[in-house]
Regions:
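N-terminal nicking endonuclease/strand-transfer module with a His-rich metal-binding environment
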Residues: 1-239
Length: 239
């Protein structure tokens, strides 16, 4: 019977880790981290079954070389405590052949990560005895690439606005046009004993006092309606 195991970790310079070292371990290879001059050698590690670099169409072709890719990431992140990459470790069904395991991983990575502009580096490790514990390592860039092949921000604020009773979210870049189209930012106002988000025009008409000067925003980009639903009080009660 197939088992389920998925572990997600952050590769952070603040924790003493590097993306180059993680990629060298994943690929069982020797790589030089140009950021600190440290060479990481995992060529003696056994059990490598497959490895591949996945790039969006806008990525530089030379990033197919994983050492070049992850050194580019290290160069971009200059802070001493930078988050460099996301790392996933997932168990693979032993019932599947190696070819099907690879196909499963390729489809998953392309659909879930590369389609959103992320670069990914993946490998299958199958330690001795073979077939006993096959698992996948996936190393993912924290920043996506834009249509010009440039790194985007790790996080992006989204302003939630209202117009004619409809609520929508806009990034900072989109808000100027949204404002011209009549959309209003929402702020917190005191309504009785509660704090309620609404537009300034609606609050002024009802005489409510604003309690926050900051507009409503989602800290980490566009809201995921599925996640929001399953984290709602209603769903928690049902659970």
């Amino acid at each position: 019977m197939a088992i389920y195991h998925l572990e997600a970790k952050m590769v952070s310079r603040g924790a003493g880790r590097s993306a180059v070292a993680a990629a060298a371990y994943l690929s069982c290879s020797r790589m030089l981290n140009e950021y600190d001059g440290v060479q990481h050698d995992y060529t003696r590690k056994q059990g490598l079954g497959w490895r591949q670099v996945f790039l969006p169409a806008t990525a530089p072709a030379e990033w197919q070389d994983r050492e070049t890719l992850w050194n580019a990431v290290e160069e971009t992140e200059t802070a001493k405590d930078s988050r460099l990459a996301r790392e996933f470790v997932a168990a693979l069904p032993i019932e599947l052949s190696r070819e099907k395991q690879i196909q499963l991983l390729q489809d998953f990575i392309k659909e879930q990560f590369v389609a959103d502009g992320m670069c990914a580096d993946a490998a299958i490790h199958d330690p001795y005895p073979p077939g006993h514990n096959p698992h996948a390592h996936i190393l993912l860039t924290v920043r996506p690439l834009d249509e010009k092949g440039k790194w985007q921000y790790k996080t992006e604020k989204e302003y939630l606005c209202v117009k004619d009773g409809e609520e929508r979210g806009f990034t900072a870049a989109e808000f100027k046009q949204a404002q011209a189209d009549g959309w209003e930012k929402q702020y917190q106002y005191k309504v009785g004993k509660k704090k309620v988000y609404m537009s300034p025009s609606a609050a002024q008409a009802q005489g409510y006092e604003r309690v926050s000067k900051y507009p409503k925003s989602t800290k980490f980009g566009r809201q995921n309606p599925i996640t929001e639903r399953w984290n709602s009080d209603e769903q928690l009660v049902l659970w």
